[in-house]
Amino acid sequence: ANYLCYLLVFTLAYALTRRPWAAVAIGGLVAMTFGIANYFVVQFRGQPILPWDFQSFATAMTVSGGYEYVPTQKMAVSAMGYICTVVLCYKLSPHGLPAPPRSLRLAERFSALAVSVLLVVMLFPLNGLEGLGISVWAWNQKTSSERTGIAAGFFANVNFMLVEEPAGYSAGRV
């Protein structure tokens, strides 16, 4: 399920650019940035990045200045691997070929977008992650994300943000 979350990012990047090397560059950068940010958040706070953390992003940026960020050796190796992969994908991609017909370009974008929509429908409102055996251990998010994967755990937590209003609720009566 974790791979499906990453596939969503890569297919959206391909739908936007229609270039495999650009999709690898964008998708890899998003995944690597999220992973590094999550590493430091776990180091400082003891739990991973959660969807509702984005609501307090400004506060996090203010507080973040008080910490020291030292990249690990694994981060450096990952960054070098990412750069090498992007360069390799760029070098292997065809250059100087005549542009394919507009209909083919649109079909490629539409296909990538269709896969992205399918992944969104599968992962989000239909609780598709639960069907894949991904559940959130709400009281220990760090262990939960270690078991399920950070991306799948993050997206599984999105369901907790989609709260239905109770029957008979009135803001005036609160």
Each predicted region: which residue ranges?
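Membrane-anchoring hydrophobic segments
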Residues: 1-35
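N-terminal secretory/membrane-targeting segments
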Residues: 27-174
